[in-house]
Amino acid sequence: VSEQSEFPDGQYPERPVERHKGPVVLRRDRRDQGSTTDQRLLDSRGPSDWVHTDPWRVLRIQAEFVEGFGALAEVPRAVTVFGSARTKRDHPEYELGRKIGAALADAGFAVMTGGGPGAMEAVNRGANEAGGFSVGLGIELPFEQGLNPWVDLGVNFRYFFARKTMFVKYSQAFICLPGGFGTLDELFEALTLVQTKKVTKFPVVLFGTEYWGGLYDWIAKSVLGGGKIGEKDLDLLHLTDDIDDAVRVVQESYQAWEDTH
């Protein structure tokens, strides 16, 4: 369509008043902040609250991804193990975590955890004591204690979503020990990513039938039974109490992946 047909008699709409802020165009009544980008950057007398604005946060988020990718790019094949930060060192689940970490190390896998205390520490410790490679991806929290001493390679994150990307990208499998909301968050995100084929299928092991059995039964009865997922979706979960069985599932899945790549 020609301009003449859109605007007969040569009557064109008046060009709106506009201001430019870098690549952003402000037109009509869009308010300007009254200064240029360079001025706000170079003027040391100005306010410093600009570092807390959303555009600046984007750069910080980008930096987290760059730092995470750079730090983890050379990590050997790894398995992420989730579990509660509240697990005490004298609790049976702590010793279980140590054994799982050691078993994964013996099988040639690096272990990756959230890097915190409790079950995470136990897994890192077990892998470290067995001579394996132990990775911790920490998160900035008001009550965070920092990375546990059994981490060989640690990366701290401000943002959960950047950290979760690293867990998925650099893991061959997830093993979930008894845990709280954080463990559940990671569990269901992994299931969703695999179900929707956003990531290559990898196993999600629920370790501890007494703890996870109720959740598994609810998914089978209510979620699958109600037609909210397909039958194959339930197969994404493997429920076990046996360390050798958990490691076997991980090894078989990794071997199947290797055979196709």
Where are each of the predicted segments found?
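Solvent-exposed alpha-helices and their adjacent loops that cap or buttress functional pockets
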Residues: L72-E74, A103-A105, A127-N128, Q145-P149, ...
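Short gly/pro/ser/thr-enriched loop/turn and capping motifs at secondary-structure boundaries
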Residues: L141-G146, T183, Y211-G214
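Active-site/ligand-binding-proximal alpha/beta "capping" segment
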Residues: R158-E210, Y254-E258
